[in-house]
Each structure stands twice: as C-alpha cells, then as structure tokens.
C-alpha cells in the first residue's frame, strides 16, 4: 500500500521541487520508504515525466521493492498503490513465457505483465490497485484503477501539465491547480453527503472511475472501461465460475468456496493481518473463515458508553466464540471531540461518514498491525440494507403515480404536502410525487441528503434547476442505465455498490486508514465473487426471517445465533446525541462562519441556520447540519487562498 504522484510536463520541464513536495505530502500513506524519478521522453525531448512514491511495505520488505520501479528490458517505469493478491500466479505465467524477475514484489509483476500483455494485463489481476506506468516504447502514460474502485486515483490536465495522484489534496498542494470550487461537485456533495466519481470538489480535478484505465499521449487523455459488475467489457471472457450450479444448495456451496478463496488470497502479506470486527454477519464471517483455515486473528472493535450505539456485546460474543485476540476501543464524547479536527484533516474529500474508521484505524495501527480485513461490501452484495425492500416499493409507487391522470395527481400531492408532518422521509415522498419516474430514480432519492428543492433554497446564487442537477448526477444516470436490466433486488445491489459503497464507504475507508499507515482489505468484494453474487436471483438474497440468507446459508450455521438474528445497527457513531451535547458549541460557531469563507457567495446563511434549527427541534437528521460543518471545514482548509 502506498501513495503515488506523477506529473507529465508537455513541452516543458518537470519542476523538481513540485515533485518532491507532492511526494512528501503522501508520507502518511507510506511511512516506510520514498522515491522519485524524472525521465526524459526519448522520442519527444521536449516532454518530461516525474514519478513519486511513498511506500507502506507489506510484500517484499527488502529494498528490491523500492518505487518508482524500472524494467530494464522495456525501459518502462511504474508507481503503484495497492495489492495484487494473485501476483504469484501471474508471475508464474510470465516466467513460463521467459521473463526474469529481480524481486519478490507484486509491483514488479505489474511492470512485467504490462510489458508482456499491454492493457490486457488488467484482466489477469485480482486485487485492489491504482497504478501509473510510463510506457517508454509507446511514449505514453498508462494509468489504471481496480475493478471495484477500492484504491483511489485522481487526475488533472492543463495545457502544460498532466498530473495524477492518490489524493486530491496532493494535486492542490502542487500550486499548479487553481483552488476553485467545482459547482457540479458541490451539488453532488449536497445531494449525497460525499462526492460521486468522477466528481470532486475542485474544478478540473477528476476521479478515474473503477474498472477504467487512462492513457496520456502527446498531450491528449483517453479513458476506457475494461470491467463492470454487470457483464464482460472490452472482450473479457466470462468467469468460468459463473457457469452451472443452478440449485440453491449447490450455489451456496459455490459462494462458500469463493468466499473462502477470497479471504485466503487476501492473507498474502509479509506482516501480520488483523480484522475489523463489528459483531455483524459480514465481519464475523471473515473471522469464521480465518479460524477454519487455522488462523487466530487479532480483532478490533469500537465500543461506546451509549448502549444504543455500541456493538460491544456482539463483537465480544464473536471473539469469544472463535477465540480471537480481541481488542476493544472505547470512544467517549471527549475522545471524539479531541480527534474531530485531525479526522476532518484526514479527509481527502468532504464526507459525512468515515470518522469511525479513523478511530479504529488509529488504535489498530498503534497495536502494531499494518493490515486488516474488513467486512465492507457485505451489505451491498448480500442485501443487508433496508433499501433492498424500500426502493422496489418506491419504484412501484413511481410507476403507479405516473399512470394516474395529472388531474388526480396534482390535488393528491398538494394534500400530502399540506397534511404530512415536516420530516426527512415525507420530504422525499413529496419529491417522489413531484418527480414520479422522472429525473431522480427512487434509489438516489433514498440516499439523498438535500433534495433539489432544498438545494435551491441553500444555493440561491447557483443554477440549481433540473438541468444543473442532472449534470451533477450524470455518473449516477450512467450507473442506472447499466442496472435497469437486473431484477429489483440486484438493481439495488448494483447501485449500492457503484454509488454508496464506492463513493462513501471505500473512499472513507481508504483515507481514514491511510492517515495512520494502515492497509484495509475487503474480501467480500473480490471482483469475481461480486459479479458471481450479482448474477444470482435477487429473491434468494431476501428472507422474511433470516437476514442475508445467501451469506448465512453459505456459512452453513457456523455463526452464533445471536449474531445471525440480531437487529442491524451499522458501524456508526452517536452523532445525534453528541451534536446536541458536547459538539454543539463547536458546530454552531463553525456554521456561523460559513458566510465568511469561500462558500460566502454560494450558500445562504439564513438557510444554514434553518437547517441547524430543524435538527435541534427534531425535524431533520443530524447528517444535514453535519454535512455543512464538514464542507465548511474542508473548503476553509483546502480552497481558501
């Protein structure tokens, strides 16, 4: 796991001090080693390429794993962040083709694989990765991101420079990117409480989307998609595991085998591996698989004094059942208050989530662990959210509503707006009644933070009409178009994976864990496993009596009953309580300043005060004022001149 940066100077020279400063800014992602190199394009001597890397040593701890890494046979160079779990298998294939290796690292496998297969090397890799490679023979930069989007990659292009990095903050820190807020990104953030790829909050900076690669050549950037959850892309062969096994029992066995394989693959490491344990089905399944494979893992859990939020009872039960080396991390209001500013500083992009991961990552790394497994993705793949039931109902409502004559719809909608209590759920129902099957799909409405109407009030100076809203949500409509052919449950699964999981959970997990030099691995979303699960009938993933029946069936009764049938709580902090108590003065003071900074010409101070008052009086969720607090903090730190 690492942090990477690169800069291509087109008809110019790479500023060496910019390369060094940008690489240093990623030190938290890679505290073990650092390296930079400046290359001259042999064919176009007017162009230079600078590559930088900060390394967290997990595989091949020797100096042979140093980056940037060069392949003398081709002249290619690579910087790489992540892990290719099947690198030994890929290496064997390459050795059989006559290639020679100097190290035991997966970095060199990527370098040689690209030299041998070109961009088709991406279909050989199973893992989480973002890498950039200077192709010396074709005089181009090749940048790629893993199929599920576990590892981040951002890029920026001007007339003179093309830059890429693991973090947006690093690009801003070069001084070559204007500190201008991106209005589509702002709308996107206010809609969902995080930025949805390829949007960022910085004008001109974009995220490379999952399962995509990018080629920079002669000053031009071209992007291609090589993989997606819903089917083969660019000639990739279907996974043979997706054929046959039509009976449910056989499929549960197959899912169990693929889960087991994914967990075992992700244990590849030259340092100890721990587990984030919440006491839910997903993380407990990882502990079960590790135990059956003869491993006694170290497990780490957050517990709170507020019993309504704490999962300590369940995580302790799992730890005792499987006899793990268990560590509990007690988080009190005072701890949160002390850590709030460092945690927000760790945010590469603003988000309403992720601070829980900051706490557990800090303590896990302090215990001497460099790598952990997480159950992230289990809810998306195995239908663990309430959205798997509510969104199909909302879809049916939208279709029925659209079939009604307008003369009937209008008075009904007006009556509901007049009589319904003013709360978040009713605001979404009102938006759905106005929208029907129109610009906002019910899934996106279910995840929505501020509706279009609320954004109009919050951003009076901006063009927040339907057209602007659609432009900001364009990536989501593309995801929806891919999901429309799936059954209702699998459609929600695809959208949760490509929207909420990708842009909130995975991104937050990455920058909050890497703030402490900790690598988080996610076996439940191995890309082949995820595609296999998405291909199964949605009806098999919902059951009136058993949560996540497909996953529970695959585990064959090995989890404690109290874990299987417990009420779902989620890995969350007691924000509702804390914002009304210890955090209230700090948040109120910050929200009062929202008119003094970079947001002063965009956001209505009056509406911000109204949002805060609605929260205090119980008319809206904590997430709305908290999102504005985080936005103000982030913009003040990164976009203020």
Predicted segment positions?
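A structural signal for short, well-ordered beta-strand segments and their strand-loop junctions
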Residues: 133, 143, 163, 372-374, ...
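Cysteine-centered catalytic environments shared across enzyme families
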Residues: 1-348, 357, 361, 556-557, ...
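Adenosyl-5′-phosphate
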Residues: 1-7, 46, 173, 182, ...
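A structural signal for short hydrophobic/aromatic patches embedded in well-ordered alpha helices
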Residues: 22, 189, 412, 530-533, ...
């Amino acid at each position: 796991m690492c942090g990477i940066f690169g800069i291509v100077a087109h008809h110019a020279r790479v500023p060496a001090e910019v390369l060094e400063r940008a690489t240093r800014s990623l030190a938290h992602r890679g505290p073990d080693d650092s390296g930079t190199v400046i290359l001259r394009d042999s064919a176009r001597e007017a162009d230079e390429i600078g590559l930088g890397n900060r390394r967290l040593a997990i595989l091949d701890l020797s100096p042979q794993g140093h980056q940037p890494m060069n392949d003398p046979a081709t002249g290619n160079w690579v910087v790489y962040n992540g892990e290719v779990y099947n690198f030994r298998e890929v290496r064997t294939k390459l050795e059989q083709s006559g290639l020679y290796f100097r190290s035991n690292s997966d970095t060199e496998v990527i370098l040689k694989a690209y030299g041998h297969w070109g961009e088709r090397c991406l279909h050989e890799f199973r893992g989480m990765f973002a890498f950039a490679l200077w192709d010396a023979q074709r005089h181009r930069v090749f940048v790629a991101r893993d199929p599920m989007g576990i590892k981040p990659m951002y890029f920026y292009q001007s007339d003179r420079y093309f830059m890429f990095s693991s973090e947006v903050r690093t690009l801003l820190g070069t001084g070559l990117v204007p500190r201008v807020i991106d209005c589509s990104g702002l709308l996107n953030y206010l809609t969902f409480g995080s930025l949805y790829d390829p949007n960022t909050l910085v004008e001109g900076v974009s995220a490379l989307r999952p399962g995509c690669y990018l080629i920079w050549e002669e000053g031009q950037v071209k992007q291609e998609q090589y993989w997606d959850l819903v089917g083969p892309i660019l000639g990739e062969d279907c996974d043979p595991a997706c054929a046959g096994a039509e009976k449910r029992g056989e499929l549960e066995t197959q899912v169990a085998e693929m889960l087991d394989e994914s967990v075992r693959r992700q244990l590849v490491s030259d340092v100890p591996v721990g587990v984030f344990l919440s006491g839910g089905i997903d993380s407990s399944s990882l502990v079960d698989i590790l135990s059956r494979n003869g491993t006694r893992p170290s497990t780490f859990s957050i517990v709170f004094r507020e019993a309504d939020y704490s999962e300590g009872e369940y995580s302790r039960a799992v730890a005792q059942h499987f006899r793990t080396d268990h560590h509990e991390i007690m988080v009190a209001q005072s701890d949160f208050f002390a850590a709030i500013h460092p945690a927000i500083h760790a945010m590469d992009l603003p988000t309403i989530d992720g601070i829980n991961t900051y706490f557990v990552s800090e303590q896990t790394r302090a215990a001497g662990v460099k790598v952990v497994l997480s159950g992230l993705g289990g809810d998306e793949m195995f239908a663990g959210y309430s959205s798997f039931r509510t969104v199909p109902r909302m879809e049916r409502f939208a279709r029925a509503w659209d079939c009604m004559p307008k003369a009937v719809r209008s008075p009904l909608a007006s009556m509901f707006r007049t009589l319904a209590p003013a709360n978040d759920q009713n605001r979404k129902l009102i938006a759905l009644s106005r929208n029907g099957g129109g610009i906002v799909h019910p899934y996106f409405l279910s995840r929505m933070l501020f509706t279009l109407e609320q954004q109009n009030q919050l951003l009076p100076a901006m063009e927040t009409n339907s057209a602007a809203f659609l432009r900001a949500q364009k990536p989501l409509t593309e995801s929806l178009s891919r999901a429309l052919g799936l059954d209702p449950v699998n459609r929600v699964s695809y959208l949760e994976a490509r929207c909420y999981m990708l842009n909130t959970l995975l991104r937050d997990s990455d920058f909050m864990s890497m703030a402490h030099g900790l690598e988080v691995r996610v076996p439940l979303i191995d890309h082949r496993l995820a595609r296999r699960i998405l291909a199964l009938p949605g009806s098999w993933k919902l059951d009136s009596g058993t949560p996540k029946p497909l996953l529970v069936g695959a585990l064959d009764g090995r989890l404690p009953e109290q874990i299987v049938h417990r009420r779902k709580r989620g890995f969350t902090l007691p924000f509702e309580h804390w914002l009304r108590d210890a955090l209230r003065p700090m948040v109120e003071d910050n929200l009062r300043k929202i008119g003094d900074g970079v947001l002063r010409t965009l956001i209505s101070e009056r509406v911000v005060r109204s949002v805060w008052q609605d929260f205090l009086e119980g008319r809206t969720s904590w997430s709305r004022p908290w999102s504005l607090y985080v936005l103000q903090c982030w913009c003040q730190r990164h976009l203020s001149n």
